Amino acid sequence: MSGAATTNTPDAVPEFRQVMGHPRPLWMLFMTEFWERFAFYGMRWALALYIVAQFHGGDSAGEAPASRLYGAYLALVYAAALFGGYVADKVIGYQRSILLGAVVMAAGLFMVMWPDESVLKLGLATVIAGNGLFKPNISTMVGKLYSVGDERRDSGFTLFYMGINLGAMVAPLLTGFLAERLLGGSADMPAYKV
């Protein structure tokens, strides 16, 4: 399972140590996707609110530009998967694409925390690029853990998607709680940056 993509011969499935009846790397991919979705949804719930509070003084006039930026961000996050899939297939391979995407996303998430609107926009663009490299390719890696016809493949994908759903479910609850308790949010200026 090299980092480079090959199209002319199917990759042989390497033997992995089994954990709970599945290849050990499945659990690493499960946790990786859990934390990626945690970061995505942990930021997503508060993004428009944060933009209005931080860059428009909480004024309702900031709702329209915040909503436009939020909408553009979400649309581009999902559209970037086309770019990321192509890059993985034709240029750097799935593993390298996932690693590069994770590093780029992390850099973007740190930029989003900077209290400057230009840096926020650059950070969102960076998250978009990283997500495009990461998101379409991690599912491909799950598929490569199992040989064609392996009966465990469906349950492996079910477990993987449980990681996605758990990250999405826990993120808004935990980040909201942390913003309130640790960062001193108040009714007039919630601590939207966790």
Task: Give the predicted meaning of each segment.
Residues 77, 154-183:
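Glycine-rich segments within core transmembrane alpha-helices of 12-TM secondary carriers
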Residues 90-102, 149-150:
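Cytoplasmic membrane-interface "Motif A"-like loop-to-helix N-cap segments
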Residues 1-41:
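Cytosolic juxtamembrane N-terminal segment immediately preceding the first transmembrane helix
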Residues 45-67, 180:
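Short amphipathic helix-loop junctions that connect adjacent transmembrane helices
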